[in-house]
């Protein structure tokens, strides 16, 4: 019989993420294919491609944008009943986009730093490491033993939600 890979769903201590955000961005960037952030449309709403309230901050990342969804109501960790002006931006990860992510202020304090909210990293097109910043919550879905070891090496506390 083959060895079964065990995967875990984790709740991660948000304060630890804030304190180790650069190391986590590096790890997530190297172990993900894409990432998403949540922003809001700004007027004129009919412009295509649309204007976002975080346009100036996100301008450097624009060459790496692969998609956007206007009017999104659900994304990893969040569901909203309203919000037709909410936008999910999807970016591909590569050496340059990882560098730009690290260069900006702390992604886990978006309101303080004027950044889009709820950064989420995707592995094999599935949500893997995400946050709900205004709730101060962070998750890791389908975490591997390697992911757990990395969190432990960074002294980031987490709880396993499944065994």
Regions found by a protein language model. Give the residues of each.
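Structured alpha/beta or helical-core interaction and ligand-binding surfaces enriched in interleaved
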Residues: 1-163
């Amino acid at each position: 019989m083959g060895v079964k890979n065990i995967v875990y769903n984790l709740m991660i201590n948000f304060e630890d993420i804030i304190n180790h955000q650069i190391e986590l961005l590096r790890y997530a960037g190297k172990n993900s294919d894409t990432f998403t952030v949540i922003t809001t449309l700004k007027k004129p709403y009919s412009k295509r491609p649309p204007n976002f309230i975080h346009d100036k901050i996100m301008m450097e990342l624009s060459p790496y944008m692969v998609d956007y969804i206007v009017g999104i109501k659900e994304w990893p960790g969040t569901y909203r009943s309203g919000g037709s002006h909410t936008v999910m931006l999807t970016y591909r990860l590569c050496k340059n986009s990882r560098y730009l992510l690290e260069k900006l202020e702390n992604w886990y304090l978006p309101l303080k730093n004027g950044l889009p909210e709820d950064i989420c990293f995707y592995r094999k097109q599935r949500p893997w490491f995400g946050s709900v910043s205004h709730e101060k919550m962070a998750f890791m879905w389908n975490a591997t033993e390697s992911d757990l070891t990395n969190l432990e090496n960074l002294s980031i506390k987490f709880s396993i939600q499944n065994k």
